[in-house]
Design a protein with these regions (language model features):
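Accessory "access/gating" subregions that flank catalytic or transport cores
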Residues: 1-18, 22-30
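Feature marks hydrolase-like catalytic cores characterized by long aromatic- and Gly/Pro-rich stretches
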Residues: 17, 27-178
Length: 178
């Protein structure tokens, strides 16, 4: 993560306003020993994100960077033995100076098994916020106009009106997007 912070630090000498850097941290497909395995991995993730934020602060870049986590699947709430099965909903972390932090965005589901939010199959919750909405807001931070979002995110209009004067979710600080 320190190497990423250093790469961000030289962006101006490369003539870049903003960059996209992708890191992969695999091994989250826990079908067994979910609690023990995930606790250790969350500790590693926490240490990495904390170290990254401290490096950004040391470089004076904390207000210029957004860190976003994403996954291609969630987990069911009901155990299938020693773990859980694949599901649709999940969660994302968004952090950085341009972010209105300390909030939960989206609608938290009723996590009671067989509730109206449970679509069956052992606690699969219907997502309430599309990843397209997260990406749409990040694209606005990169300077993509609202009208052009549907070129990059063909499904965005299923969740957000590109003619809106507001952001898809609202996690960006006012004045940090165009």
């Amino acid at each position: 993560m320190l190497a990423v912070a250093k790469t961000i630090a030289i962006r101006q000498s490369l003539g870049l306003r903003r960059q996209t850097i992708f890191l992969s941290f695999g091994g989250w497909d826990h079908h067994g020993e979910l609690l023990n395995t995930e606790a250790g991995m969350l500790s590693v993730l926490d240490g990495g994100l904390t170290g990254f934020q401290k490096a950004l602060e040391a470089l004076g870049l904390q207000d210029d960077v957004i860190t976003f986590t994403a996954s291609d699947f969630g987990r069911t709430l009901r155990s299938n033995g020693r773990g859980t099965d694949h599901a649709w909903g999940g969660n994302n972390f968004v952090m950085g100076g341009p972010v209105q932090g300390g909030k939960i965005y989206g609608t938290f589901p009723d996590v009671t098994l067989d509730s109206n939010d449970d679509v069956g199959y052992g606690g699969r919750m219907m997502p309430t916020t599309s990843v397209d909405q997260f990406f749409g807001e990040l694209l606005r931070w990169f300077g993509v106009s609202s009208a052009d979002l549907s070129y990059v995110l063909p499904n965005i209009e299923n969740f957000y009106s590109v003619n809106s004067s507001t952001l898809p979710i609202g996690f960006l600080q006012p004045g940090t997007w165009s």
